């Protein structure tokens, strides 16, 4: 099962948590979920050049807190913060709650699956060989500190008449191990021959503690350059 299912969904409440972190009554749930989808889609379109990895949305009482993880925060913030104010005003149109906007810099984009997938897709759109783009992404991730990475590309590769799938892997990528810290993302490259799909899995180590926030905490420590805390057992067995 671990080979087929989305590795992030499989690890929810084990060592991963959701990107939308709020609770709502049944009558409000659909509207709030639609707000989240619209805001995420708008942010990815508006800040396409900023290298947006993920958007976390939290909803404390009568407020909406949006946290954007990006490799190039200066593109979103703009000169003297002018662009971020424009973005805040545009996002406020999607929700009735008071909006708070935070920007978090990703210091090691080579270890972020979403940014790696988008980089490979953009290279293929610029007519770079798909094999060269895959190999470059894999080598950069392993050089920065990934324990394993796998990249899949599917479609009319190289303009071939028949679509096919090719993949490249280095290191270990244990998809069936729940304690494995696996980052996963997809992207698409629009080429003259059609759309080429890109999938990326990055293995960053193991998380032995049972904590849904463990991945985010480990990611923050790695981006700040601090040594990750050593894994601990969840409970001592009797």
UniProtKB/Swiss-Prot annotation:
GO cellular component: cytosolic small ribosomal subunit
Compositional bias of kind Basic and acidic residues: 212-222
Pfam assignment, any one: KH_2
GO biological process, one term: translation
Keyword entries, A-Z: Ribonucleoprotein, Ribosomal protein, RNA-binding, rRNA-binding
PROSITE patterns listed in its UniProt record: KH_TYPE_2, RIBOSOMAL_S3
NCBIfam families registered for this protein in UniProt: rpsC_bact (TIGR01009)
Family to which the UniProt record says this protein belongs: Belongs to the universal ribosomal protein uS3 family.
Role played: Binds the lower part of the 30S subunit head. Binds mRNA in the 70S ribosome, positioning it for translation.
Name of the featured protein: Small ribosomal subunit protein uS3
Protein's organism: Cereibacter sphaeroides (strain ATCC 17023 / DSM 158 / JCM 6121 / CCUG 31486 / LMG 2827 / NBRC 12203 / NCIMB 8253 / ATH 2.4.1.) (Rhodobacter sphaeroides)
């Amino acid at each position: 099962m671990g080979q087929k299912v989305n590795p992030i969904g499989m690890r929810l409440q084990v060592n991963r948590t959701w990107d939308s972190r709020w609770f709502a009554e049944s009558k409000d749930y659909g509207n709030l979920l639609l707000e989240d989808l619209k805001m995420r889609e708008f942010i990815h379109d508006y800040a396409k050049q900023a290298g947006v990895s993920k958007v976390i949305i939290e909803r404390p009482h009568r407020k909406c807190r949006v946290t954007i993880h990006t490799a190039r925060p200066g593109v979103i913030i703009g000169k003297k913060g002018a662009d971020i104010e424009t973005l805040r005003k545009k996002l406020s149109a999607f929700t009735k709650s008071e909006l708070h906007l935070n920007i978090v810099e990703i210091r090691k984009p080579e270890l972020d699956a979403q940014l790696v997938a988008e980089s490979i897709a953009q290279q293929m759109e610029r007519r770079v060989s798909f094999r060269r783009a895959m190999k470059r992404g894999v080598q950069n991730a392993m050089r920065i500190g990934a324990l394993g990475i796998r990249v899949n590309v599917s479609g009319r590769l190289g303009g071939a008449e028949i679509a096919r799938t090719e993949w490249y892997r280095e290191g270990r990528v244990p998809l069936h191990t729940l304690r494995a810290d696996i980052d996963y993302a997809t992207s698409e490259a629009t080429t003259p021959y059609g759309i080429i799909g890109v999938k990326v899995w990055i293995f960053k180590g193991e998380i032995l503690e049972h904590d849904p926030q463990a991945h985010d905490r480990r990611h923050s420590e790695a981006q700040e350059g601090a040594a990750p805390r050593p894994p601990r057992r969840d409970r001592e067995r009797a």
